[in-house]
């Protein structure tokens, strides 16, 4: 599934200024917008935007950069959307915006890139705007390795007044303490359903697709947009449910053949598949506790999920969901793919089918290798 970089919010052609680069385009609370404005005008310390994948870091960083580069910014709304700087940024690039990210064929930013693109250009005056902005990706543990972070320390500490830094990360604790101490961190939390709905409305998707994306988004705008724009998402979800709903009646051989084959075929969608499986289990747990089906993530599958609940009275969806989360963590730590997925499928079969499960086999409260 494509990552979330920047989904431009389109304004109606009313003759009004283009607000797609302003803080207005960010679906968030007023308090959060005040934080962003403060980081632009009042506190010019290097900014560290921390938020999980899909939280909108790139989108927000671009609006912050636009405000810093703008010739006529508004102190509460950010970029004007009309000046030469804003018009250049709307084309997709800008002479005074330096974006540092891993090359397409690599997962890490080479330390040479940090030295040449940051330290090597630090003293060059801006060409169009009053400032120059460096947006640096340090998303994953290996995106900006220790040597690259060390090369960034002096520029963060000593730079001309026209230079501003924005660093993006999913986990600030993975960064060197010296990077964190030189930065001001803003944490990007999950959005409310209304805020996600506003973002989805601007994609022009049909209500059914947008509704499903909203329920699966879990407060993450990037997740919602990726799902709403992926024509295969509903098909993948339905194929996953066919496998999931058959697990209680399946054999061990089924799990190790057809079940494992499905996960190998869809390996690129693993993160999404695990979220989908967890959503099925969440819904089953709600039904098991007598909750209103209208509150299900997969509300369109309510009848099928209800049938599963009735057929396996001894099912333990809570323990099954813990196994799915544990599997995600193990795979993120590079556990063997086939072994880990097979173990999960066998465990789900047992937990969802109400079969006896030896405690020593599936210790869902502990990690495994």
Where are these regions (language model features)?
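Charged, glycine-rich active-site and insertion segments that engage polyanionic ligands
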Residues: 2-66, 88, 123, 161-163, ...
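Conserved alpha-helical scaffold flanking the Walker A/P-loop in AAA+ ATPase domains
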Residues: 34-39, 110-133, 139-143, 147-150, ...
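Short metal-coordination and nucleic-acid-contact micro-motifs, chiefly zinc-binding Cys/His arrays
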Residues: 45, 76-79, 132
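A short hydrophobic beta-strand->loop->alpha-helix junction that borders the nucleotide-binding pocket
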Residues: 50-51, 99-104
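Post-Walker A helix-loop "phosphate-sensing" segment adjacent to the P-loop in P-loop NTPases
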Residues: 66-78, 89
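Short cysteine clusters
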Residues: 80-86
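Iron-sulfur (Fe-S) cluster-binding segments and ferredoxin-like electron-carrier domains
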Residues: 87-98
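Structural recognition of the conserved hydrophobic beta-strand(s) that form the central parallel beta-sheet
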Residues: 134-137, 152, 163-170
């Amino acid at each position: 599934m494509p990552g979330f970089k920047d989904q431009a919010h389109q304004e109606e052609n009313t003759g009004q200024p283009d607000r797609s680069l302003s803080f207005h385009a960010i679906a968030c609370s007023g308090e959060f917008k005040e934080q962003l404005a403060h980081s632009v005008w009042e506190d010019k310390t290097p900014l560290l935007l921390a938020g999980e994948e899909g939280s909108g870091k790139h989108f927000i960083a671009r609006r912050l950069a636009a405000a810093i580069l703008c010739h006529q910014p508004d102190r509460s709304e950010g970029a004007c959307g009309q000046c030469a700087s804003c018009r250049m940024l709307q084309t997709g690039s800008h002479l005074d915006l330096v974006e540092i990210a891993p090359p397409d064929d690599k997962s890490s930013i080479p330390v040479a890139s940090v030295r040449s693109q940051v330290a090597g250009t630090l003293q060059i005056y801006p060409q169009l705007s009053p400032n120059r902005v460096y947006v640096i990706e340090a998303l994953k543990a290996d995106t900006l390795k220790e040597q690259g972070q060390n090369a960034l320390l002096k520029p963060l500490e000593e730079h001309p007044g026209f230079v501003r830094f924005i660093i993006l990360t999913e986990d600030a604790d993975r960064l060197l303490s010296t990077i964190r101490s030189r930065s001001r961190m803003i944490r990007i939390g999950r959005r409310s359903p209304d805020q996600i709905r506003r973002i989805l409305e601007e994609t022009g998707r049909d209500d059914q697709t947008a509704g499903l994306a909203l329920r699966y988004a879990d407060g993450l705008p990037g997740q919602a947009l990726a799902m709403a724009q992926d024509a295969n998402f509903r098909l993948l979800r339905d194929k996953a449910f066919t496998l999931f709903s058959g697990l209680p009646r399946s054999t061990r051989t089924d799990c190790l053949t057809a079940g494992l084959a499905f996960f190998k075929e869809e390996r690129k969608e693993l993160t999404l598949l695990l979220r989908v499986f967890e959503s099925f289990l969440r819904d089953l747990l709600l039904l098991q506790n007598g909750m209103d089906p209208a509150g299900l993530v997969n509300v369109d599958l309510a009848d099928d999920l209800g049938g599963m609940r009735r057929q396996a009275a001894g099912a333990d969806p809570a323990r099954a969901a813990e196994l799915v989360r544990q599997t995600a963590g193990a795979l993120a730590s590079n556990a063997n793919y086939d072994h880990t997925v097979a173990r999960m499928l066998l465990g789900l079969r047992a937990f969802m089918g109400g079969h006896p499960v030896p405690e020593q086999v599936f210790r869902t409260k502990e990690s495994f290798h």
